[in-house]
Amino acid sequence: MSSPMSKKDYSSEIICAFDIGAKNPARTVLEVKDNSVRVLDISKLDWSSDWERRIAKDLSQYEYTTVLLERQPRRSPYVKFIYFIKGFLYHTSAAKVICVSPVMSGNSYRDRKKRSVEAFLDWMDTFGLRDSVPDRRKLDDVADSFNLAMRYVLDKWNTNYTPYNRCKSRNYIKKM
């Protein structure tokens, strides 16, 4: 006999988005169910040492249906994280792993990061979670992971969100 909690709810989708990096990787986990979005987790991670074990632990915390990874330049030292995640989930999960371009585009790195944090804080107001956002100067990594996940959800719903408009929608997904 199984309990209702042990049965997988197939009407919901668990979306995980990673902003890749060794020092400041970040993860956002959203549950999309019946046209609503619930924030399950927004975390700064640390993959600076023993990264294989730490990534495996971070990947094993939820049953994802979709994992979004921020695309990295071909010669980036962080490409190893993408291949490790794809390999780890290949036989152990039904999750779809997708490499996507960053949400924000623009002339300067600083401008992109500023707009990403502003959009993130606006979403935190919308979800009623602004008070739980720590007062930190380094929010751009969690903001980037959150914006990756929200752009994916909004694109699935064919919903336009002005801060994400500078990205050519639907062209951001690329097989790696």
Swiss-Prot record:
Cofactor(s) the protein requires to work: Mg(2+)
InterPro entries: HJ-resolvase_A22 (IPR006932), RNaseH-like_sf (IPR012337)
Keyword Ion transport found: no
Signal peptide: none
Similarity section: Belongs to the RuvC family. Poxviruses-type subfamily.
Sorted UniProt keywords: DNA damage, DNA recombination, DNA repair, Hydrolase, Lipoprotein, Magnesium, Nuclease, Palmitate, Phosphoprotein
Functional description taken from the UniProt entry: Plays a role in DNA replication by cleaving viral DNA concatamers to yield unit-length viral genomes. The concatamer junctions contain inverted repeat sequences that can be extruded as cruciforms, yielding Holliday junctions that A22 protein cleaves.
GO biological process: DNA recombination; DNA repair
Domain of life: Viruses
Organism: Vaccinia virus (strain Copenhagen) (VACV)
Cofactor note: Binds 1 Mg(2+) ion per subunit.
Recorded GO MF terms: four-way junction DNA binding; magnesium ion binding; nuclease activity
Name used for this protein in its record: Resolvase OPG149
This enzyme's EC code(s): 3.1.-.-
First-tier enzyme category under EC: hydrolase
Gene from which this protein is expressed: OPG149
SUPFAM superfamilies named among the record's database cross-references: Ribonuclease H-like
